UniProtKB/Swiss-Prot annotation:
Main location: membrane
Taxonomic lineage of the native organism: Bacteria, Pseudomonadati, Pseudomonadota, Alphaproteobacteria, Rhodobacterales
UniProt-listed GO biological process terms: phospholipid biosynthetic process
Name of the protein: Glycerol-3-phosphate acyltransferase
Transmembrane spans: 8-28, 57-77, 88-108, 114-134, 159-179
Function: Catalyzes the transfer of an acyl group from acyl-phosphate (acyl-PO(4)) to glycerol-3-phosphate (G3P) to form lysophosphatidic acid (LPA). This enzyme utilizes acyl-phosphate as fatty acyl donor, but not acyl-CoA or acyl-ACP.
Enzyme class label: transferase
Length: 200
């Protein structure tokens, strides 16, 4: 097992970032002949925008694979050296998804990757966040609202369910979710945010 030394933290930070940087939405859209996601809907590379192509399978695969990046980063780092490495790998996987080197640092909004990270880091909290996402999204039919609700719910859920050690990371991840959704928040306020399944 690798101890949580600075070199180990740096190594798993890089591994997490590179995992997070894999643009599964872009790859699937190209392989499945759906076009360039940058020219579709919001131009985002995540599952919500893939759904705007009309291909539900591609959207579901994007959701699972983007979430899987977070799961793999956290579990692999934990197996190598414990919770410190798991948290840094998870944080960097999120940053990699949002700012991937392969796409000139213009990536997705991190919702699926966030949920994957939390599920792997603290499973009960992750389940609660998934339920919060579903509640927010289906109550409003706005995907971004579900993301915001889930990110806000994460910290109190961590305290309630006995995972206080994850709180700092969850605050950082939540702040990144809000930052990446700042345009969505502005549209929610003006009532112009697209509904789930609606072309932007």
């Amino acid at each position: 097992m690798i101890e949580s030394t600075l070199p180990a933290l740096a190594l798993w930070g890089v591994i997490g970032y590179l995992l997070g940087s894999i643009p599964f939405g872009m790859v699937l859209a190209k392989v499945m002949g759906l076009g360039n996601l940058r020219d579709i809907g919001s131009g985002n590379i995540g599952a919500t925008n893939v759904l705007r192509t009309g291909n539900k399978l591609a959207a579901a695969l994007t959701l699972v694979l983007d979430g899987g990046k977070g799961v793999v980063a956290v579990l692999a780092a934990r197996a190598a050296g414990g919770e410190d490495l798991a948290q840094i790998a998870g944080l960097m996987a999120m940053i990699g998804h949002c700012y991937p080197v392969w796409l000139r640092f213009a990536g997705g909004k991190g919702v699926a990757t966030f949920l994957g990270i939390v599920l792997a880091l603290a499973f009960p909290v992750g389940v609660g966040c998934c339920l919060a996402w579903l509640a927010g999204a289906f109550a409003t039919r706005i995907s971004s609202m579900g993301a915001l609700v889930a990110s806000v719910a994460a910290v109190p859920l961590a305290f309630l369910l006995g995972f206080p050690g994850a709180v700092v990371l969850l605050i950082l991840l939540g702040a990144l979710i809000f930052w990446r959704h700042r345009g969505n928040i502005a549209r929610i306020r003006t009532g112009t945010e697209p509904k789930i399944g609606q072309k932007k």
